[in-house]
């Protein structure tokens, strides 16, 4: 099965009340999931969206995930390999922030063939705009 997933996270204050959302698309269906946390950060919410979307997909699938977070896209496609080798330390030898969520995201990706695409936020992409509105609504 081929799927597209649009994800976003938002935070009212940083830290503050946060929301995450994902829209999952296949050839004929569209579904959305979302959630919130009280004392969190925007980066944690950006990570929660793809984690929760991937958890929802039970069948092994070919998935393209669209995110407007370079933190998530670069982290999962590049930085995580180095973090694992360096015992979860970043290039400054400091512990990687949000390690718990990076591990969850990495594990969730193993079940599928995942391609990551960065898209510019607020640039007129229909699904990016929808997922942004949904994530922001969860911060209220």
Residue ranges and their predicted role:
Residues 1-44, 55-57, 132-133, 137-140:
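RNase H-like nuclease fold core
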Residues 10-17, 52-130, 134, 139:
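RNase H catalytic domain
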């Amino acid at each position: 099965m081929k799927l597209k997933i649009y994800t976003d996270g938002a935070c009212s204050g940083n830290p503050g009340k946060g929301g995450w959302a994902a829209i999952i698309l296949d050839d004929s269906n569209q579904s959305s999931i979302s959630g919130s946390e009280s004392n969190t950060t925007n980066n944690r919410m950006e990570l929660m969206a793809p984690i929760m979307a991937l958890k929802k997909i039970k069948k092994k699938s070919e998935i393209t995930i669209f995110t407007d977070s370079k933190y998530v896209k670069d982290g999962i496609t590049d930085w995580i390999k180095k973090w694992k080798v360096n015992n979860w330390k970043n290039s400054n030898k400091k512990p990687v922030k949000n390690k718990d969520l990076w591990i969850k995201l990495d594990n969730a990706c193993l079940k599928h063939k995942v391609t990551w695409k960065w898209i510019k936020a607020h640039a007129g992409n229909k699904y990016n705009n929808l997922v942004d509105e949904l994530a922001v609504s969860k911060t209220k």
